[in-house]
Amino acid sequence: MATDPSPARNRRETLVFHVSDVHFGLEDTDAIAWVKREIAEKRPDAVAITGDLTMRARHREFEAATRWIRSLDVPITVEVGNHDLPYFNLIERFFTPYKRFKGVESVVEKELDLPGLAIVPLKTAVRAQPRFNWSKGWITDAALTKCLDAIDALPEGVKALVAVHHPLREVGTKGTALTHGGQKALTALAQRPVLGVLSGHVHDPFDLTQETVHGPVRMIGAGTLSQRVRSTPPSFNELRWDGETLTVRARNLGDVRTRDMQIDDVPEDAMPPRQPGEPVAPVNQVPRADPPVH
């Protein structure tokens, strides 16, 4: 499967690299070195990292993530993923959950203002939830209000890309929803100048539309740069905004075309698809064994 041809950079374009789920501790070293080279060569206007910098929020994992982020030398915003909250230290998880981001705290949940475009954060990873599976997303009223206020404050004519970790898809009942409050958030975003919602979490790229009572919202998911692949090789998204059209390419080391990289629905988690009906990318690089988790 041949890769998409790389278009020449239009000076009037805004170029954004959408990276997710690097999972330092189980990172793919070839993939992160390649992305670093791509950033140095193409000099994107911004890099949006949509969560799960680490595997288990260990100090050494954050130290490696900090070194990598600092080496990129471009405007960056980082969303917090469920894997980035302290896993073993519950006191720290509840009282100082972002403590281990020291060194890159200035870019955590940071709004980036670009020519005609803003990247606005929306927090979906929380310390605790009234359900057993805390790895899933939960949007609080305060987090949604903060995001909407930021979008409403943008200058007239400026579009927004909303950066989250969990896709804003509610699957099943409230107890099993991938992101509790996701549909409410999408409905509110549909009433605003939002180009799309950038997410991670599920380790496969996608470019889908979710309907709401106020119209459709584009949902753009990035793959992973870790060893924990689902059905596609490690990848990131290259976004180009020319003032009218937002194009998305799923860049990858496997030279696979974007359309062969993207799944056609949002799965409930990042585990490789083993059951009938689970979304699988056309390239179908499902690992024979489940990836490591530690």
PLM features: residue spans?
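N-terminal active-site segment of His-dependent metallophosphoesterases
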Residues: 1-71, 87-88
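Extended active-site neighborhood of metal-dependent phosphoesterases/phosphodiesterases
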Residues: 63-146, 154, 188-190, 213-215, ...
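A short C-terminal boundary segment appended to hydrolase-like catalytic domains
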Residues: 1, 241-294
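Charged helix-capping and loop-helix junction motifs
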Residues: 32-33, 61-65, 139-142, 176-185
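Short acidic, glycine-rich surface-loop motifs adjacent to enzyme active sites
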Residues: 151-171
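Conserved beta-sheet core of the metallophosphoesterase superfamily
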Residues: 174-244
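Active-site environment of divalent metal-dependent phosphoester hydrolases
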Residues: 25-27, 55-60, 82-90, 126-132, ...
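Active-site neighborhood of phospho(di)ester-bond hydrolases with catalytic His/Asp-centered motifs
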Residues: 18-20, 47-52, 76-82, 123, ...
